[in-house]
Amino acid sequence: RKMKVILINGSPKEKGCTYTALREIEKQLQKNNIETEIFWLGNKPISGCIGCGSCLKTGECFMQDKVNEFLEKVPKTDGFIFGSPVHFAATSGMLSSFMDRVFYGRRKLFSNKLGSAVVSCRRGGATAALDEINKYFGISNMPIVSSQYWNMVHGNNPEEVLKDEEGMQTMRTLGNNMAWLLKSIEAGKKAGIK
């Protein structure tokens, strides 16, 4: 089986700034023979977790939306990159609700799978939003993949993001780092390391 990474676009804009950053990462992963998928959350509301615990019993959320569609893909995926625009120094409400529900009852699915956060912002609040996403990985036994700088791009539209040379280089490095770590883990498994 070919290794796979899902890049989650947590922006209500399908092809905006967050997508532009994720697409740059995706290109590097594909150059490294990693299968990819950009999973867009869409532009319809995603309800927050109500803590009912039904997912612990059934394996899926009772709310039938993008959460269950995504959870079906998790077992056959090796790494995840969650991307979000910065809204008031935080992730988009949509991504926050999505991640709460994804990780609430199904955290064990992510154990030892790679995780990384990416944010796009016009000016500020990026590191706070990155920290928010990374907390899900830290509590789920997920190694976090980093880059040469914080995983952020700056711009108010995709054209401005493409002009953020340092940000785009950070995305390329992140893609290469994710591919390298996936290949290292695969080599370790082949050598008998469990």
Set out the residue ranges of the language-model regions.
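Helix-loop-strand module that forms the ligand-binding subsite of alpha/beta enzymes
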Residues: 58-149
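A structural preference for short, hydrophobic beta-strand core positions in alpha/beta folds
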Residues: 37-40, 146
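Glycine-rich phosphate/pyrophosphate-binding loop and the adjoining helix
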Residues: 26, 31, 69, 143-194
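N-terminal beta1-alpha1 ligand-phosphate binding loop
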Residues: 4-32
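N-terminal beta-loop-helix "entrance" segment that forms/cooperates
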Residues: 41-61, 156-161
